[in-house]
From Swiss-Prot, chain B:
The gene is GNB5. It comes from Pongo abelii (Sumatran orangutan). The keyword Membrane applies. Enhances GTPase-activating protein (GAP) activity of regulator of G protein signaling (RGS) proteins, such as RGS7 and RGS9, hence involved in the termination of the signaling initiated by the G protein coupled receptors (GPCRs) by accelerating the GTP hydrolysis on the G-alpha subunits, thereby promoting their inactivation. Increases RGS7 GTPase-activating protein (GAP) activity, thereby regulating mood and cognition. Increases RGS9 GTPase-activating protein (GAP) activity, hence contributes to the deactivation of G protein signaling initiated by D(2) dopamine receptors. This is Guanine nucleotide-binding protein subunit beta-5. One of its GO terms (cellular component) is membrane. The lineage of its organism: Eukaryota, Metazoa, Chordata, Craniata, Vertebrata. GO terms for biological process: G protein-coupled dopamine receptor signaling pathway; negative regulation of voltage-gated calcium channel activity. Belongs to the WD repeat G protein beta family.
Amino acid sequence: MAAGPAPPPGSPRAQMPHLRKMERVVVSMQDPDQGVKMRSQRLLVTVIPHAVTGSDVVQWLAQKFCVSEEEALHLGAVLVQHGYIYPLRDPRSLMLRPDETPYRFQVRLGGAAIYLAKKNIRKRGTLVDYEKDCYDRLHKKINHVWDLVLMQAREQLRAAKQRRKGDRLVIECQEQTYWLVNRPPPGAPSVLEQGPGRGSCAASRVLMTKSADFYKREIEYCRRALGRTRVKSSVCLEAYLSFCSQHRPHDPLVSGCLPSNPWISDNDTYWVMNAPTVAAPTKLRVERWGFSFRELLEDPVGRAHFTDFLGKEFSGENLSFWEACEELRYGAQAQVPTLVEAVYEQFLAPGAARWVNIDSRTMEQTLEGLRQPHRYVLDDAQLHIYMLMKKDSYPRFLKSDTYKGLLAEAGIPLETKRRVFPFMWRPRHSSPSPALLPTPVELTAACGPGGGDGVA
Amino acid sequence: MATEGLHENETLASLKSEAESLKGKLEEERAKLRDVELHQVAERVEALGQFVMKTRRTLKGHGNKVLCMDWCKDKRRIVSSSQDGKVIVWDSFTTNKEHAVTMPCTWVMACAYAPSGCAIACGGLDNKCSVYPLTFDKNENMAAKKKSVAMHTNYLSACSFTNSDMQILTASGDGTCALWDVESGQLLQSFHGHGADVLCLDLAPSETGNTFVSGGCDKKAMVWDMRSGQCVQAFETHESDINSVRYYPSGDAFASGSDDATCRLYDLRADREVAIYSKESIIFGASSVDFSLSGRLLFAGYNDYTINVWDVLKGSRVSILFGHENRVSTLRVSPDGTAFCSGSWDHTLRVWA
């Protein structure tokens, strides 16, 4: 049985939306005019009315939803697995065969108790172990109506003896399917299995009763939201178009990658050529540094070149300061006071060795905040320096000889020819786990002496 | 006494109507700037070619349903967790298992790889998030160095490291998200506002790195300010639980996958839903979504065992991938976008390219 608390029976959580949707599909499949063609199917010597063939089901689904036959077959198989359609031949396996195999639509769902009771009566108490468990549990659960269940079971058995062979066969298949779907044998997967129960937490129960607090929070949120500026849809949507087209050549799943996609060719050269720190970055990689300041900083090679460039312009302290602030923001809680102190000494104190040029108002506010250091205390100063680099140093870097040179030097890898003999086994190179390597030299080690200035 | 009760009821009713009218105004404001739809703008975009994606690796080794997976920054290693408590680290390129640890609980619904590649985090029905340093020392038992970081009052549904190994963001069935200091286990910030279980979260790829989005059983997707703990934006258009949220690579939007069988795109600057990815033939819930590197493709894993590939701009379904033999429970694109990995209740993980 599924682990975790099960949803209470009949609760809204138990009504999964996909079941309702499947029911709707099955109902439209049975429409006399638009539905699947019903006919009488011959099963050995018996004739079963109102049956459909597997291939008709697949065709109907493919047409109705404008999908391929493969997809229609998959969808049909799902309907069979959930018991909405049941096979008249070989009811032990709930599969949809796209051929003349006959199927019928499940008319009623429910009555596990009745089914078991009938089996119990027929076989005179020789239910299989797991069936017996279910029987006992059901008995306990619906004890008060058990007499009714037994009565119905006896009535159905009596009626069954009088029914025609065809009807008996149909009912048997129906019930066998129901049993397979709702109580699969141990070890077999169940389509009805759900993950751990959701919505059972206290939060949902408490907030279901919409209290005054709940509405007050909503009102506050709405007021804030109304005050926010929004951007016109056309502007926002155009931004996607330009982002997608700019990044398209860099998207391996859309445009492929050179020399080859390692997963497809089993050759990891692409990764070797694009390693985090590499002497000769590829052309695509160098191009990306020009997309945005963030892309430049996120690439260790790009950042290193930018650091050198800043050094030449004697503004290396800006990047170092920014890196130190990042270290503070994402560092361990216990380190916060030490890091704040170190940053102050190095970058903000009057006469500091690597004093950063922030506007007086931000500086004042920052120094004020330093009295009670916390991890976000340098945010304003950090943002100021970031914007300075982004608006000033970064554009100059892109126009610089350094960058232009890198772009010109950078190469485009040649495509690896596909292997001529695909059955030749090519060993897949393993790579050392990052966990094995010594602690990587952090680029944020700005608090060290002379970090990243490019000064010899 | 009787008059006091009456007074309370009136206040509640007036609060409710005030909230409702403000919500209406908000909708009006949003609608004013709605001058064009995405599929209209996308008409002049070139259509994508034929898509052939196949399973390139199958990772077998879990003895039970795979519930979650995450990529390492080295672009080839992954960590995966399953219903029976097993957490495995693989080099998925060679398909070798490198580490395995058994959690003391079942249904490990969340796992994450640390940015350094030296640790993993995981949790589930134990209501906690634990961090395991990865060690290759044969004498050391991985479970010995385990650090218990987060403590919730209900199951852990998602976890993610921030920019470093030292902070973890968690989402829980107790309706909250929380930010933790790994070393001390201290709660740095908590995020309240969801009306039911929170099922997923994703950190924003922004320059200033301050926000994240979460989705829950209350059908809401909420964007949070990590510093203040406040909800800055909320979207409520799905018709059922939101199982997965993922930012568009520019950080200006995010996609969601829900039990209502649709995926949706929400723009943060326009402050509204801008696209719905759905098809009549798709009946089962989407359990996990992720974008390709350029944001042009959206991969979504569904509870009917399939993976659908959507053209984000045009809104059409580009491809359907068969292969898994049970629900697809988790899906992530690799850090360099060369492949994506899917995990399933059929006990396997597949890498597709």
